């Protein structure tokens, strides 16, 4: 899939989709905007290993769309959290710099058609 079509792919193919990671089915859901309960923090994405759910934000707090690169990177980022959690690498899943770095590298490789 070309990167330029990824945003449409996310909206058409990922919305309310299930994926299998290891032996578990994970649900992926798109949210317009994800703010903390106190409205002080914004999340581009979130994964929940207990409920096997991944959420991706499609809009920023100011209601503008999340740009394509950020959405792609967040998708990879949250999938990596899920992969590590399923593989019983909880400590590594909680390592945000590691997950962020691998997500950025995977996206870069994807853009080079190396994946």
Predicted regions span which residues?
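Phenylalanine-focused residue identity feature
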Residues: 6, 42-44, 75
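Short alpha-helical catalytic segment bearing the HExxH-like zincin motif
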Residues: 70-78
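Active-site scaffold of zinc-dependent metalloenzymes
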Residues: 15-69, 82-86, 90-105
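Short, Lys/Arg-rich amphipathic alpha-helical interaction segments
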Residues: 111-115
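N-terminal amphipathic/basic-hydrophobic helices that include classical n-h-c signal peptides
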Residues: 1-11
């Amino acid at each position: 899939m070309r990167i330029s079509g990824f945003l449409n792919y996310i909206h058409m193919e990922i919305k309310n989709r299930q994926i299998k990671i290891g032996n578990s089915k994970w649900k992926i859901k798109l949210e317009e905007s994800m703010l903390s309960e106190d409205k002080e923090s914004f999340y581009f994405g979130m994964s929940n290993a207990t409920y096997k759910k991944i959420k991706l934000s499609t809009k920023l707090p100011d209601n503008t769309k999340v740009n394509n690169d950020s959405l792609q990177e967040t998708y990879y980022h949250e999938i990596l959290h899920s992969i590590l959690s399923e593989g019983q690498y909880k400590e590594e899943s909680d390592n945000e710099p590691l997950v962020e770095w691998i997500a950025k590298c995977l996206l870069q490789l994807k853009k080079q058609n190396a994946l």
